[in-house]
Amino acid sequence: MKYMLSVHTCEGDVRPAMSAEEMQQSWQQITALESEMKSAGAWVFSARLHEPETATVVRVSNGEVLTTDGPFAEAREHLGGFYVINAQDLDAALGWAAKVTRCIGEPIEVRPFAGTSED
């Protein structure tokens, strides 16, 4: 079954400044985790996203398509990135989410894809 692991970040949260060496170690941990996911057949896709200010919302109103600069909702928390994974069940997906949050230090929301029971 496919799951989305959403990486949530909080605008304005001050994270400790990382030295170049610490940043390199962090990327090595993420790379190692993604390699582990790939070896286990869990990794499908992952991506980081730009800040919410770079978003554009497209919607229909009275039959007309409108675009608005900025995020869909003004909120302190926003989607910073995501993983799409294959996992046997929720417990397995939660196990991967635990590894991701340990690696990056951000909360992870785990949700199954609708309409699929395997893949």
Please annotate each region the language model reported.
Residues 1-119:
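Conserved, structured core segments of small domains
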